[in-house]
Amino acid sequence: MIKTLASVALSLGIAFGSFLPVLSIVPLQVVSPDRQEELGLDEQIWRNSGQKGDRQALLTAIDHSMSYLRSPRAITAYRRYPVRGITRDRVIRSLERFRELVLSSNSPEELQAAVREEFVFYRATGKDGRGTVGFTGYFEPTYTASRVPTQEYRYPLYRLPPNFSRWSRPHPTRLQLEGADGLSGDGRLRGLELVWLRYRLEAFLVQIQGSARLQMTDGSIMTVGFAGKTDRPYRSVGRELVNDGKMNLAGLTLPRVIEYFDSSPEELNRYLPRNPGFVFFRETGGAAATGSLSVPVTAERSIATDKSLMPPGALALIHAQIPFPSRNGELEQRQVSRYVLDQDTGGAIRGPGRVDIFMGTGTEAGERAGRINSNGELYYLLLKN
């Protein structure tokens, strides 16, 4: 879904032929994992605390990355990848070996020991040069929509204009395209409506997440995915609310933002246009949510990063806080060490200090994704040469 919530690339100087891109920053550094005892101890793969493990989901995510890595697109991407020592062949061999270890290991401890023995840990240098990475979450929302506009369903998602490649730059802003109220743009999108949603904030959030599963009023299910975006930068509406004193940065979560606009709907006209970027969609025929590598993303096993800096499709390890339902139904934060695959990107995911975790589809996934907002660490795992 090329992620747009929290996602595309820092500037690189690209030189073709035998030269690599020139990096203005160093995104990854080799480190020893020994300083953190719990690093690589992924308890979710096996049954834990009475819950079913997700080993098959992890294996499926690995297979999706392998599918990408064998494509011509991956060959091109890795020819230009700037970090010395990280090649497509090494990434493939690393995934093949890790998959074998996941199948042969019988416990988190056994897998952790094998990974520490056989793999090199490349830590993201983070937003401070010392490995501090900011984590957020994203999800595939589910909403009700209509194939035709009605009094109830008024807010459209739009197809990519057929002449989009010929639009003059910079592209029009969100305000120009859809108006302050989301319904009174300059007319250039007229006739490109794909579906209509009931609430304006829902249509906006589909643009933020980059895809959606829609329950149509005629009883059918439609899935939509990213088709393109304007060249305007992403600007966080939540940050705008913080800047204006509407909420505190410490309490900034997606549920809080939704709650604010539900109680003050007149503020939508003021704040949504402050994000000037605009996303277009296509119908995806019921396909699973798909990342920027054109392979499906897997709940809690796929991440989005800046693909100008990080190796696409590669095996990674995150050390971060993720919310889980407690026994009383509330969400509580837990520190986890989780093996993931780097399979997506997004308009606000820039630099070596940002990661977005895909949390799945639907309301619960959205609740959990919206509460991920903390610092952690990101590592890429490559077989020792």
For the regions a language model picked out, list residue spans one by one.
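Bacterial N-terminal signal peptides that target proteins for export
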Residues: 1-9
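Bacterial N-terminal signal peptides
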Residues: 9-21
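C-terminal soluble interaction/assembly domains
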Residues: 285-385
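Secretory/export targeting leaders with adjacent low-complexity proregions
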Residues: 27-285, 292-295
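Generic alpha-helix initiation/capping and coil-helix boundary signal
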Residues: 8-11, 58, 335
